[in-house]
Design a protein with these regions (language model features):
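Catalytic cores of alpha/beta
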Residues: 11-19, 69-73, 97, 115-125, ...
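C-terminal alpha-helical cap/extension of soluble enzyme domains
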Residues: 155-218
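Glycine-rich phosphate-binding active-site loops on the catalytic face of alpha/beta enzymes
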Residues: 29-33, 112, 129-140, 183-202
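Active-site beta->alpha loop and helix N-cap motifs at the rims of alpha/beta catalytic domains
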Residues: 3-5, 9-13, 19-21, 27-100, ...
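Conserved, mostly hydrophobic/aromatic
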Residues: 28, 86, 122, 178, ...
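A contiguous pocket-lining binding segment that forms or flanks enzyme active sites
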Residues: 111-165
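Glycine-enriched alpha-helix->loop->beta-strand junction motifs that scaffold or abut catalytic
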Residues: 20-24, 80-84, 100-108, 124-131, ...
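Alpha-helix-loop-beta-strand connector modules within alpha/beta enzyme cores
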Residues: 44-58, 95-108, 144-164, 207-218
């Protein structure tokens, strides 16, 4: 499973990259606003900065909600950098845009996916990635991980090439559950990625090794 970091914070992206396990990054308008990045030109420059850090794909989300606007914005985003993936919502206009971009070899990430039906249409339209939102489904007492597993099963059964990118990951357990479900990618906050490293027995074992070494090398 690939690891993407879900943030627009350059410091966090660099920190994840330094671990040596980062495969890409995802952003959205809320994450850009959190970093106080305003205006189209500033956003576009920021996407390029992220691409200069991350060696894999970087999802940049468009703002338009109509088909024509999505096409205009998406073509601009795709031209910024070869590793930019155009991120767009799973709506009627979004599915039309995915089909349009697929015909032009522009890669897409169909986001805000909450049902198997949405995931099916995204794959049929030719999306590169589909992003089911695990945490947001859990928030309304639905099973986000079960949706990931269902999408994986359908895609494998029918041979769809669209990659399942598990999103809205809240904690390390979500990552492990999505791994078990067969997700191709999990996009996570830095804290969740770092959480995979932590285990009390690792800490206590290292402490004992160091103490024993110090005792024998006084």
């Amino acid at each position: 499973m690939k690891f993407f970091i879900d943030t627009a914070n350059l410091e966090q992206i660099r920190k994840a990259h330094e671990l040596g396990v980062l495969d890409g990054a995802t952003t959205n308008p809320s994450l850009m606003a959190k970093e106080n990045i305003r205006g189209t030109e500033n956003c576009n420059r920021h996407y390029v900065e992220i691409c200069n850090i991350v060696e894999g794909d970087v999802s940049a989300e468009l703002i338009a909600t109509d088909f024509e606007g999505m096409v205009r914005e998406g073509e601009v985003l795709a031209a910024l950098h070869p590793r930019i993936v155009v991120k767009l919502p799973c709506t009627a206009a979004g599915i039309r845009a995915v089909k349009y971009f697929a015909a032009k070899d522009i890669r897409t990430n169909c986001t805000l996916v909450f049902s198997i039906g949405q995931a099916l249409l995204a794959a049929k339209a030719g999306a590169t990635y589909v992003s089911p939102f695990v945490g947001r489904l859990d928030d309304i007492s639905e099973d986000g991980v079960a949706l990931v597993a269902h999408i994986v099963k359908v895609y494998r059964t029918y041979g769809y090439k669209t990659q399942v990118l598990a999103a809205s990951i809240r904690h390390t357990q979500h990552i492990i559950q999505c791994l078990d479900a067969g997700a191709d990618v999990a996009t996570c906050p830095l804290a969740a990625i770092e959480g995979l490293l932590r285990h009390p027995l690792t800490d206590s074992g290292l402490e004992k090794f160091l103490a024993d070494h110090a005792r024998l090398n006084v």
